[in-house]
Amino acid sequence: MIRAVLFDVGGTLHEVHHSPELETSFCQRLLDLLSAHGIALPITAAELAPRLHENAEGYKHWSEQSRLELPGAKIWSEYYLKEFHLSEELLSPMAEELSWMYDAVRVENIPRPNMQETIRTLHREGLKTGIISNIISTTFVPRLLEDYGIADLMSCVILSSTAGVRKPDAAIFEKAAAECGVPCGEMAYVGDTLSRDVLGCRNAGVALSIQISNPSIAHRDTAFTGTGLAPDVLIHDLSEIPGIVRAFNAR
């Protein structure tokens, strides 16, 4: 019996669109924020953008291997801005704002069709809903849920930035289950990746793994091609979820 449906955020509740213009604009805001705190970097926004992308990929690789999420100031100091030798202590006052901007300004987030109504339908049908998200910001997701008008429907919001551990580690799913008061064996999880979401469900013993199609991130799952790892259900629209859960519970 499914009693809770939890969601990933980026790529699941909304699609994430990238562009060189957004990257450069973000880097200019980053430089302006640092300057406002008395830190002047000897680089232009256009020069910083590709370097930041490369550094972020380096951190992503490390975090995916370790399944750990470092504190924001440490990420910016040791990875994202590593060439500039800025200490954690120096970056700490602005680290969260930088991390929030990384997901709010660097990209365009476009809500998926039927997102709010799907979550409201699940809630009306007596199911708990919540979030498990890999993210370096501690404030981006809570602010986003408020903007989407669904914050009050969430029984739990578990972020790697506060948990210190990332999907696909079972621990982050178990933390969400404990906070929702529902065991993993009575939980469904909706995400867009095999490598983090579907594998995480398998690791934690989540009852129902639902993957929503997202071709833009397929390259991150190439290592799992041909391994047999697959979701219980693949969907193309969030509105499919209530019916899937009803059918599961009717078995």
Describe the predicted segments one by one:
Residues M1-V5, E15-H17, E21, I39-I43, ...:
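Asp-based, Mg2+/Mn2+-dependent phosphohydrolase catalytic module
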Residues V9-G10, V16, E21-S63:
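Conserved phosphoryl-transfer catalytic core
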Residues E21-L31, L68-E78, I135-I136:
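Short acidic alpha-helix initiation/capping motifs at coil-to-helix transition points
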Residues A45-S99:
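A metal-dependent, Asp-based hydrolase signature
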Residues A56-L70, Y102-P113, R166-I172, A207-L208:
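Short amphipathic alpha-helical segments at helix boundaries and their inter-helical linkers
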Residues S99-M101, I158-L159:
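Short beta-strands and strand-loop turn motifs
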